[in-house]
Amino acid sequence: MKLAFLYAGQGTQRVGMGRDLYEAYPAFRRVLDEAPVDFDLKTLCFEGPEETLGDTRYTQPAMVAFAAGVTALLYEANIWPQAAAGLSLGEYSALHAAGVFTASQAIALAAFRGAA
């Protein structure tokens, strides 16, 4: 069986996203803890406010960090894609999944994109 990872674009963010994964899985926690952003990513994702999380400057690196964390969990479970694709912002996560960027590089690029 062939497997592809498909990553969402901006607009799927929600306050609380990733909290359960962060608390339960060190691989996910590592990605968020090491995210190269200039704001408190965990507080914003877990507690909001929704208006700030919806601001492109914050949404884009948050979404890529979340996706990279989930990807780390899949890889840790020895689940590997034969293909990866993303919709709009999700392309950064797909490039990370394909090994083009590290998680930190993909998050930093998304932060730059969101601030532009």
Give the ranges of each region predicted by the language model:
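FabD-like malonyl-/acyl-CoA
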Residues: 1-116
